[in-house]
């Protein structure tokens, strides 16, 4: 496995680049905007292809690299289902698995620092975001933080992992790089409490000043810019309501870009072909299945995904590949359901 812990000294943020091997798909956790060039350089050196960029939560102390990485690599951007961030193209829930070639991150909902905080378990290590820090815990006094929820996330979720599980947080300000669950149980001063009420009192009494970047970072991270807006401006989008008859039209092929777990949870549009977004480029290129289908039948390719972000990028890629009539369903499966479109489970 390729594993790199990368540090932004300005914000004290750790980002994590992960892949199963050289030449494979990669994902990155908690990227920082100012470090995007470095991430891309490192991935080029390691012959990696970024397919997913993940944030553990809405950050208040730096601007995320999710939007820039999406624009420069066409990767899938991932956050928890509670997140309101507009750049997110895939939303996950507790118990899901974020998969790339050869690896899978097990998704754990660990609210408390914020209401959209997640941790991700990969074999012998857990990426805890700002929920559990090295000899500390994330503050709970803004962004719908809740010390009671954080206590539950730490004591009833994270601390139940094996003692030798490596802990990789999103931040450290003392120079520490990694800990273990066992170390934090024994030595973390904020975990030396006898009850949830004692923990709540401890966290409520911290009286911390707001992060220096908070007034800039939070709004910037909420609005990274939708790929859908530009695609709609070019006339390459259809509304879900206008697409309601597409499943029965002989001149249209619907293409579902979501992953299998998303389809199982949220349902499928009848008759749609399943081409997961990471496999799209091969399918639309010369000799690819979708390119051949469009050439042989003359059908219009209509892409859709969960929210419309992946499908917007797919339309651009398809048109770049010569599929000049490709469009996507603006707003994805969510908009389709709101419009009353048929769904099969």
Protein language model regions, located:
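Active-site neighborhood of phospho(di)ester-bond hydrolases with catalytic His/Asp-centered motifs
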Residues: 28-31, 49-59, 78-81, 110-112, ...
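Conserved beta-strand hairpin/beta-sheet module of binuclear metal-dependent hydrolase folds
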Residues: 1-49, 119-129, 135
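Positively charged, proline/Ser/Thr-rich regional signature most characteristic
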Residues: 230-301
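Accessory terminal helices/loops
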Residues: 152-166, 170-241
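Catalytic cysteine-centered active loop of the rhodanese-like fold, especially the PTP/DSP P-loop
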Residues: 108, 259, 275, 286-338, ...
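Divalent metal-coordination and catalytic microenvironments
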Residues: 18, 30, 57, 69, ...
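Core dinuclear metal-dependent hydrolase active-site scaffold
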Residues: 5, 17, 97-122, 160
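Active-site HxH/HxHxD metal-binding segment of metal-dependent hydrolases
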Residues: 12, 23-25, 33-109, 186-187
């Amino acid at each position: 496995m390729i594993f790199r812990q990368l540090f932004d000294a300005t914000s004290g943020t750790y980002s994590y680049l992960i892949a199963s091997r050289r030449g494979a798909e990669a994902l990155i956790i908690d990227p920082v905007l100012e470090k995007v060039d470095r991430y891309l350089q490192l991935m080029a050196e390691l012959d990696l292809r970024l397919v997913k960029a993940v944030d553990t939560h809405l950050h208040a102390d730096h601007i995320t690299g999710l939007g820039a990485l999406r624009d420069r690599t066409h990767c899938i951007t991932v956050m928890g289902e509670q997140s309101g961030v507009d750049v997110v193209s895939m939303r996950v829930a507790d118990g899901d698995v974020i998969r790339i070639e050869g690896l899978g991150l097990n998704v754990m909902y660990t609210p408390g620092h914020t209401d959209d905080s997640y941790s991700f378990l990969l074999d012998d290590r857990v990426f805890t975001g700002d929920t559990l820090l090295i000899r500390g815990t994330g503050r709970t006094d803004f962004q719908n933080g809740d010390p009671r929820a954080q206590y539950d996330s730490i004591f009833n979720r994270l601390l139940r992992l094996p003692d030798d599980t490596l802990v990789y947080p999103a931040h450290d300000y003392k120079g520490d790089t990694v800990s273990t669950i066992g170390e934090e149980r024994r030595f973390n001063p904020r975990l030396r409490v006898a009850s949830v009420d004692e923990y709540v009192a401890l966290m409520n009494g911290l009286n911390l000043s707001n992060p220096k970047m908070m007034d800039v970072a939070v709004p910037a991270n909420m609005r990274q810019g939708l790929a859908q807006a530009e695609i709609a401006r070019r006339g390459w989008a259809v509304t879900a309501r206008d697409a309601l008859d597409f499943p029965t039209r002989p001149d249209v092929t619907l293409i579902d870009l979501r992953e299998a777990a998303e389809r199982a949870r949220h349902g499928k549009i009848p008759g749609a072909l399943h081409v997961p977004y990471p496999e799209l480029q091969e399918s639309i290129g010369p000799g690819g299945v979708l390119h051949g289908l469009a050439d042989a039948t003359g059908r219009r390719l209509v892409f859709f995904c969960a929210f419309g972000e992946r499908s917007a990028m797919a339309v651009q890629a398809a048109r770049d590949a010569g599929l000049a009539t490709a469009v996507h369903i603006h707003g994805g499966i969510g908009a389709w359901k709101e419009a009353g479109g048929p769904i099969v489970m």
